[in-house]
Amino acid sequence: MSAYEERIVRTMEAFRRNRYDVSRFAECTAAADYLAAEIRGKRVGFGDSETLRALSLYERLRVHNEVIDPPRAGHGGIEAFLAAGREALMTDVFLLSANAITEEGQILNMDGAGNRVAGSLFGHEKTYFVVGINKLVPDIEAGIERIHHIAAPRNAHRKGKKTPCAK
């Protein structure tokens, strides 16, 4: 087994020790297929996530579910975004990504509006974190570095925010 493969296996085992169910997919399309098959007839809330957009999960899941995606509602202004964000907190299922995950089985998220973090913590029948290998870091310190130097600046640029990290 390669060092790369060992790192992934070690991370999956750490998440299992922390009582998370973990699935691994060789291709992004397989992950999207899995979620589309698993989630049917539900109200589904989304946290703001480029990962979910890249997998076309909104389009895939809305075929058999009612999907609430605050960024899509946000085109109607901040009030529409906030209303959809509150509604997403009351759904059966919640999907989001993470800014970073550690090899120790920890999830790191920094959230501007709070809707992603709030949605990940309470109330849903199921919560799915959809993360790519690009989010994997050795430890919390590396995760914080990833947030400060990769995730937050990209998010600020995408949203046109003039935050210190976006410079």
How should these model regions be labeled?
Residues 4-95:
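N-terminal active-site beta-alpha-beta segment that forms phosphate/nucleotide-binding
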Residues 89-167:
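Conserved phosphate- and dinucleotide-binding cores of soluble alpha/beta proteins
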